[in-house]
């Protein structure tokens, strides 16, 4: 049954209930909805814009929980609908739909849980589900079938595809490059690792966790003596490690920019939460790169390429919605965004079209933890597997595999299903528990990972990889009873963390979770049999593989390419047009004022922000670095900055890498680094159109080698990073737009005194000459 409430602003709040509500309960809901009045009709006429019926919004999840906390029972779903004049009104088809009247069926999804399917034809299933499995991987799965003596289930094939996607396993970076007929001596990953091997400096953990950790200073920790109950606060000294991480969410942001960027920010925060046995995020960064937004007439440079029939969103919509999404998540979670960049670019030469039609959205940040907890523990048989966070929904299915290929290759339905939704409040609750456990004298966490691509199957298998584990599916929270076993196992719903905890500590952790209102579920245990399985209540296992079958033998990737020399015409300038050139340059999004990005995001929450973007009396966004303090009374802190040069990289990929590092370093130089360059570590995030055209793979190799060599010569390390190597957009008419090969470098390190950061504000000093 659905009740309709009309708010004072004329929107309609639809409330699904499992039973008839007492008049007192209806009055409570009316008060909760801002003195809304309940409609007596079961059906409402008119046109309304509201959420898609199959996607329960985060707003609904939180609203339903509020009703539960008020003592109301039987409320299942709450959504808001906005009246419009007619069906021609604009709305976002990714998240919303047009309703020609509201009735009792608006939440009905005519889907029954699909049964477990044993896959008879891997090739057909691969294409149908958009799994992006290679021929070699399918051959490998056929071998696994032979070893098992049975056909693989849809859950096993789907899960394997996500776990072993390029997005998750970075096969190109670990693969062998053969360029101009010659096998290269080192893989891309080996060249990046070389920087830390030769110059470890202060690095404690690199390349093996969700984040990189560098040795930090001793600072004060201000926290309750006991987090499981009301207690007094104490101050104690802790030996810290500094975390650095940057993540990209390019495909989801291209398809649905608000949730794509929002979940990108959320995922990067969870990466820092999931470092070691848990750590604390403190401040974020963001980068947006799109094609020209074409916001005004008369911007001649934007005519270099004709306007495309954009697959999902226009560049202007992406810039607005993506920055809204990243800002929204940080604001709701309580993480300030203190450093960032924006770039728009298109170019055409020799018949090749370059533009960020497949956009770049980078979410990065810095944080810290205790040196005690910076390395993960080793699981022992009988450890409990805990999931913390929200329910399972049909959201974010196949994101790992779909984001590993050109956007536009698969149907819009598959690509939309791969986009997650954001619920920052749920993530904050889970974080509060992790924070509490890390602040205690004895942290009970053995290991921790976040739920990202592939959901439970990826996260929980990583927790038990050394030992094997069994997950009881009836213990997992199900928000949508129509989910199949495959969808339960692999969805990316909401914000969730997987923890491995000693059995003796479960009760204590549950007390903390209850205080923080963080949903916590003990869903399984380590088994010691080197297998990983999901088991239904009836004993059927839709997923049951040996751990080494999941991780150990994915075929090696070979990248065969040849060097292609590309020549670009020299640009000619006329001195008589200097003023016109300046006028144009000042209009570029990369140059013009960024207050439309900074003014909508919290840049000071936590009380530890020493330097954010906006400076001077009128708070212009001028600062090139962000700086945070590590406690409330000390001077020690962390600085972070960014650098990129994709335009230069088009002409010379090696120069692009060097300039990206140089920009990050010249941006961070305004903060007093504790030990100079030895304090600085870099994250390198590579966005490249691999296999898009001849010569691109060779260009990537050149770019990575140049960055490695340059960092080694400067004696600095690159202990973390990420790659997104399918930066191509395909259109139904066959047109292919290639994103320029791009490396974004994030710098971070310890600051000796956060009060001595040089400001970009010029001061009129009468004593100066």
For each feature predicted by the language model, list its residue ranges.
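A structural-propensity feature for long, helix-poor, extended segments
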Residues: 483-488, 493-496
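Short, conserved secondary-structure segments in the cores of folded domains
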Residues: 375, 758-759
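Flexible beta->alpha loop and helix N-cap segments adjacent to enzyme active/binding sites
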Residues: 762-769
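Core nucleic-acid recognition elements
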Residues: 1-407, 412-426, 430, 434-442, ...
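Anionic-ligand anchoring segments at beta-strand to alpha-helix junctions in alpha/beta enzyme folds, i.e.
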Residues: 459, 464-486
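C-terminal substrate/ligand-recognition segments
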Residues: 648-649, 653-657, 661, 668-671
């Amino acid at each position: 049954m659905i009740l309709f409430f009309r708010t004072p602003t004329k929107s309609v709040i639809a409330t699904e209930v499992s039973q008839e509500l007492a008049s007192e309960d209806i009055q409570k809901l009316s008060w909760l909805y801002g003195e809304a009045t309940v409609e007596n009709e079961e059906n409402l006429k008119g046109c309304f814009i509201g959420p898609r019926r199959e996607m329960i919004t985060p707003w609904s999840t939180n609203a339903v929980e509020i009703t539960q906390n008020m003592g109301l029972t039987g409320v299942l779903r709450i959504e808001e609908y906005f009246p419009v004049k007619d069906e021609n009104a604009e709305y976002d088809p990714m998240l919303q739909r047009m309703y020609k009247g509201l009735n009792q069926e608006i939440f009905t999804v005519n889907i029954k849980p699909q049964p477990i399917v044993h896959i008879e034809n891997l090739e057909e299933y691969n294409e149908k589900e958009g799994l992006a499995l290679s021929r070699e991987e399918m051959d490998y799965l056929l071998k696994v079938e032979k070893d098992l003596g049975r056909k693989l289930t849809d859950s096993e094939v789907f899960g394997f595809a996500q776990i072993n996607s390029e997005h998750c396993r970075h096969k190109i970076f670990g693969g062998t490059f053969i360029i101009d007929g010659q096998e290269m001596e080192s893989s891309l990953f080996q060249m990046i690792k070389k920087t830390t091997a030769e110059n470890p400096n202060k690095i404690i953990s690199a390349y093996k966790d969700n984040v990189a950790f560098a040795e930090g200073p001793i600072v004060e920790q201000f926290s309750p003596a006991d987090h499981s109950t009301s207690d007094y606060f104490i101050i104690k000294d802790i030996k810290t490690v500094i975390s650095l991480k940057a993540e990209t969410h390019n495909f989801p942001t291209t398809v649905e920019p608000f949730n794509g960027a929002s979940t990108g920010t959320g995922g990067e925060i969870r990466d820092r939460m999931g470092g070691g046995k848990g750590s604390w995020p403190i401040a974020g960064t963001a980068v947006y790169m799109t094609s020209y937004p074409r916001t005004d007439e008369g911007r001649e440079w934007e005519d270099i390429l004709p306007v495309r029939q954009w697959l999902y969103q226009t560049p202007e919509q992406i810039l607005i919605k993506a920055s809204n999404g990243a800002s929204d998540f940080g604001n709701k979670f309580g993480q300030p965004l203190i450093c960032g960049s924006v770039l728009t670019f298109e170019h055409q030469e020799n018949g090749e079209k370059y533009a960020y039609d497949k956009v770049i959205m980078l979410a990065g940040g810095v944080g810290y933890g205790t040196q005690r907890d910076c390395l993960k523990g080793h699981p022992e048989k009988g450890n409990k597997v805990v999931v913390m966070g929200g329910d399972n929904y049909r959201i974010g299915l196949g994101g790992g595999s779909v984001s590993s290929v050109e956007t536009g290759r698969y149907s819009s339905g598959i690509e939309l299903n791969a986009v997650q939704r954001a619920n920052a409040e749920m993530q904050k609750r889970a974080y509060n528990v992790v924070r509490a456990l890390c602040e205690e004298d004895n942290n009970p966490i053995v290991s921790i990972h976040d739920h990202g691509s592939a959901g439970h199957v990826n996260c929980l298998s990583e927790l038990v990889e050394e030992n094997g584990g069994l997950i009881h599916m009836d213990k997992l929270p199900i928000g949508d009873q129509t989910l199949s076993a495959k969808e339960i196992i692999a969805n990316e719903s909401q914000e969730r963390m997987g923890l491995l905890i000693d059995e003796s500590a479960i009760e204590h952790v549950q007390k903390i979770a209850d205080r923080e209102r963080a949903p916590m579920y003990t869903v399984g245990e380590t088994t010691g049999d080197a297998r990983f399985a999901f088991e239904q209540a009836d004993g059927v296992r839709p997923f049951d593989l040996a751990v080494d079958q999941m991780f150990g033998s994915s075929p090696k990737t070979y990248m065969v390419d040849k060097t292609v020399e590309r020549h670009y015409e020299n640009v000619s300038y006329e001195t008589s047009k200097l003023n016109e050139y300046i006028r144009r340059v000042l209009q570029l999004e990369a140059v013009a004022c960024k207050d439309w990005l900074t003014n909508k995001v919290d840049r000071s929450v936590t009380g530890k922000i020493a330097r954010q973007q906006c400076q001077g009396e009128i708070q212009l966004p001028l600062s090139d670095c962000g700086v945070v303090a590590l406690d409330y009374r000390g001077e020690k802190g962390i600085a972070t900055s960014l650098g990129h040069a994709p335009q230069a990289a088009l002409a010379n990929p090696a120069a692009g890498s060097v300039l990206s590092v140089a920009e990050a370093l010249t941006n961070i130089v305004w903060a007093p680094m504790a030990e100079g360059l030895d304090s600085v570590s870099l994250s390198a995030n590579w966005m490249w159109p691999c296999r898009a055209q001849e010569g691109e793979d060779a260009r990537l190799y050149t770019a990575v080698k140049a960055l490695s060599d340059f960092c080694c010569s400067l004696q600095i390390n690159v202990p973390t990073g990420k790659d997104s190597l399918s930066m191509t957009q395909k259109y139904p008419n066959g047109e292919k737009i290639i994103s320029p090969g791009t490396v974004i470098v994030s710098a971070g390190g310890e600051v000796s005194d956060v009060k001595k950061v040089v400001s970009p504000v010029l001061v009129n000093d009468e004593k100066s000459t």
